[in-house]
Amino acid sequence: MTVPGHRTDLPAELQRVHMVGIGGAGMSGIARILLDRGGLVSGSDAKESRGVIALRARGAEIRIGHDPSALDMLAGGPTAVVTTHAAIPKTNPELVEARRRGIPVLLRPAVLARLMAGHTTLMVTGTHGKTTTTSMLIVALQHSGFDPSFAVGGDLGEAGTNAHHGSGSSFVAEADESDGSLLEYRPDIVVVTNIEADHLDFFGSVEAYTEVFDRFAGRIDPGGALVVCVDDPGARALAERLSGSGLRVLRYGSTGTGALDATLLEWTQQGTGAVASIALRTEARPLTMRLSVPGRHMALNALGALLAAREAGADLESVLDGLAGFEGVRRRFELVGSANGVRVFDDYAHHPTEVRATLTALRAVVDQAGSGRAIVVFQPHLYSRTVTFASEFGAALSAADEVFVLDVYAAREQPLAGVSGATVADAVSAPVTYLPDFSAVAARVAASVAPGDVVVTMGAGDVTLLGREILAEVEARA
């Protein structure tokens, strides 16, 4: 284990860091990089998790539960306390104690910005698809001989991790727009996947939400580039607003959307993968792009990653090879397993657009098999999002053959009167069952499925735990 007095390449403020909520996807990635760069890390979280266990194995000191004494785990005490204000209340006893002691309290984005300093920075933002597109970009660069540092919101299939301190000069990361913290960064290359209304509980209006993307684009380094998916109306409008700004804008999308730098000409589902025909402005002839993940939206994400990788100097053939081998990201249409002819996938989709995209991919998988039904187990995420998008969720989920709706996963929110999973279930036109008792879900779903059916558990909460339970129940009923 690292000891006090050792050498690091970290700024003084980040050499001994205590992290409140260390097990989360974003926080655990920061902890990994700090440890890799020679820092000392302690932390706390509300419960054990894969992230907590992995960080302990790398030398982090971690407690379950929150107590002021947690700040004494590092010899000499922490030089900074890091948290994410979206999940941790200011009344947290460790944050209160840090302020009492005069220890700087930093938010995760500010720390990530410090870690990216001195690198060529490539970032992906947008309402949906950030984690997958960022991961595709990382893999494309790795297959081109780069060793980028990276921080991403999910575990890469190939790397098995959500963060890495690389030996190269580039750093790839997501830029989360949900709380405006992406304005901490000064990137060189930015990919914008899409822009549509979300996180209105924080921004208050669609206009304020949209504006943060304009402001972020204004922070791109002179000589850098903005890569935009013009299939999406919100992202296309951003590109149009910036057309006379002097910023170089690269556009990608489908045919019929104007002169593009990368065009998706054709796309064909092949099992749980796909093959696409694409055209690049720099190439005389169409090219074949193969993917190991399903869904037309994934092909568009891959085009954005391809353009960004090429901007960073990556070889085209190597990029295409990397994209062909991309295994996906944990909880992004991830195969959990199969039992008695029933396949179960898990997906993070928690916005109507994401639900539609995932169901399109699910439907293609079912149609390719030639039999079976598409079944969704959906858990609404946040009361505010549920009440805002109930009808849109209902319309999106109605593309399934059967839907099971769980109660709302509250996360950081307090309940809203009259809002529950039934609010969404009532808007679904397909056969639907509302299941407020989480413990009864696996058995109820297993009783409904038949060989050939494909089930996807969907949402940003603990619905992810149900996939294996459903498979176990299916096996038990054989």
Curated annotation (Swiss-Prot):
It is found in: Cytoplasm. InterPro entries: Mur-like_cat_sf, Mur_ligase_C, Mur_ligase_C_dom_sf, Mur_ligase_cen, Mur_ligase_N, MurCDEF_pg_biosynth, UDP-N-AcMur_Ala_ligase_MurC. ATP binds at residues 126-132. GO terms for molecular function: ATP binding; UDP-N-acetylmuramate-L-alanine ligase activity. Pathway: Cell wall biogenesis; peptidoglycan biosynthesis. Its main location: cytoplasm. Transmembrane segments: none annotated. Pfam families: Mur_ligase (PF01225), Mur_ligase_C (PF02875), Mur_ligase_M (PF08245). Its EC number is 6.3.2.8. Keywords: ATP-binding, Cell cycle, Cell division, Cell shape, Cell wall biogenesis/degradation, Cytoplasm, Ligase, Nucleotide-binding, Peptidoglycan synthesis. It catalyses: UDP-N-acetyl-alpha-D-muramate + L-alanine + ATP = UDP-N-acetyl-alpha-D-muramoyl-L-alanine + ADP + phosphate + H(+). Gene3D superfamilies: Mur ligase, C-terminal domain, Mur-like, catalytic domain, NAD(P)-binding Rossmann-like Domain. Disulfide bonds: none annotated. One of its GO terms (cellular component) is cytoplasm. It comes from the Bacteria. One of its GO terms (biological process) is peptidoglycan biosynthetic process. It is an enzyme of class 6 (ligase). Belongs to the MurCDEF family. Cell wall formation. This is UDP-N-acetylmuramate--L-alanine ligase. It comes from Mycolicibacterium vanbaalenii (strain DSM 7251 / JCM 13017 / BCRC 16820 / KCTC 9966 / NRRL B-24157 / PYR-1) (Mycobacterium vanbaalenii). The gene is murC.
